Amino acid sequence: MYQLEIIPGKLSLKQLREVSRQPTQLSLTEDALPEMLISAEAVAQVIKDDKVVYGINTGFGLLANTRIAAEDLETLQRSIVLSHAAGIGTFMDDATVRMMIVLKVNSLSRGYSGIRPLVVNALMQLVNTEVYPCIPKKGSVGASGDLAPLAHMSTVLLGEGEARYQGEVITGAQALEIAGLEPITLAPKEGLALLNGTQASTAFALEGFFAAEDLYAAATVCGAMSVDAALGSRRPFDPRIHRVRGHRSQIDAAMGYRHMLGQNSEIGLSHQQCEKVQDPYSLRCQPQVMGACLQQIRNSAVTLEVEANAVSDNPLVFADDGDIISGGNFHAEPVAMAADNLALAIAEIGSLSERRMALLIDSGLSKLPPFLVDNGGVNSGFMIAQVTAAALASENKSLAHPASVDSLPTSANQEDHVSMATFAARRLTDMAENTRGILAVELLAAAQGLDFRSPNKSSELIEQAKMQLRERVSFYDKDRYFAPDIAKANQLLKEATYNALMPATLLPSL
């Protein structure tokens, strides 16, 4: 169980990675309480002064000019939650919901949303008791915030909707009972504060970001293994090459490969004097390609850490200034573009891996047995495993198409430009799964190739990586049922086993 004290607006990527990995016990710093109380009092004062302020005593969207009577204000907030809970599709994973609630608590507790502490505490209690609202994955365009997903989250606070507890779907009323909560009657603006925000898009994007980091680490390990398995040159990783180009991430990527390849590989030393001038690009240009991918990962890290700590509600309550202002912080364009760039990186990591794997099974290029198996003809070896990798790489090319360039007006053209951030971020999970599958196939192939170089050994780190695989999958001496081997290699990568082999500071959240 991860213990997380939220300092409003100060969540780190390392903390959020832990939230994504395991159940979390939340608490809030005492400093947050007065800020929320002052903000909530500012909203209450609007009602007392009989002012007209959007979201407090008006309708929403195109109905923003409709004044709501004082006796209907509680109904207004309840109605917006129930009417906006219009999502569709399979439910988000518990980890996604947990992340989404943590992000929402972080945003609301900064004191710009006019929401009472008891509502924020109730959200934390759901996480602390591992009661997760059932939230359909589909139904948000990422502006005016992630309305439908956040509405589904909020229904449980009212004793409505559904939740999941210990794998079972239960009613919202049962969820509150398990969490030790009573149904909440929302005060003015609180329903809107819960629904407005980019927390669903950002939760999906953070999951994709952490997966991209894991895949980058795995690809560096697999790529280094393939270099030695194919008797590739270490010269392309010379720091001088990358220093004169100047891209920091390329320089760091090359450093990662040198770290893995080491100085004392018997395989590397065995062909130092060979006459081969240049390796194919999939080996030689790894620092350039992976460096570009690393740059996209790092850029996304900056954007997503800011967004994770952002106030993306509307309107915003600036109690110290006596002002409540309507704006557009709910528009998730930064998240959409960060997710699109992550999609490019994830696709390219997989594409390069598939090409290395194809090189390994080609005996003319790798000088290894055809399809990495003895007695070819009788045995087909890795022939169709490479086809699987190719299929996954091709699928990712379609999924990598930018989502942020799409927009479809909603709410009778009041919300006439939207970000599509939720889809942009959500598809990263499928893309990461595809790339992980490609890398699993390469990992098996590279380990097979290294074993064919016996008795010569690779570097200490590469031998360690190979040993971790061989504890689960044995050498492929003849054809056997292949799918279980891919599944075991895939699971090894899913556990982020190779993150520990990366140099410190290479990846933002590690």
UniProtKB/Swiss-Prot annotation:
Q: How is it modified after translation?
A: Contains an active site 4-methylidene-imidazol-5-one (MIO), which is formed autocatalytically by cyclization and dehydration of residues Ala-Ser-Gly.
Q: What is its EC number?
A: 4.3.1.3
Q: What organism is the protein native to?
A: Photobacterium profundum (strain SS9)
Family assignment from sequence similarity: Belongs to the PAL/histidase family.
Reactions the enzyme catalyzes: L-histidine = trans-urocanate + NH4(+)
- Show the PROSITE patterns listed in the entry: PAL_HISTIDASE (PS00488)
Q: What are the alphabetically sorted keywords of the record?
A: Cytoplasm, Histidine metabolism, Lyase
Identify the coding gene.
Answer: hutH
Citing just one GO molecular function, the answer is: histidine ammonia-lyase activity
Cross-link 5-imidazolinone (Ala-Gly) mapped to chain = A143-G145
Q: In which pathway does it act?
A: Amino-acid degradation; L-histidine degradation into L-glutamate; N-formimidoyl-L-glutamate from L-histidine: step 1/3
Q: Which residues carry this modification: 2,3-didehydroalanine (Ser)?
A: S144
Signal peptide range in chain numbering: none
Keyword Glycosyltransferase annotated:
no
Domain of life per record: Bacteria
List the GO cellular component terms. cytoplasm
What Gene3D superfamilies does this protein's entry cite?
Fumarase/aspartase (Central domain) (1.20.200.10), Fumarase/aspartase (N-terminal domain) (1.10.275.10)
* Name of the protein this chain belongs to: Histidine ammonia-lyase
Query: Which example biological process does GO assign this protein?
Result: L-histidine catabolic process to glutamate and formamide
Compartments (UniProt record): Cytoplasm
Q: Which Pfam families is this protein grouped with?
A: Lyase_aromatic
HAMAP family, alphabetized = His_ammonia_lyase
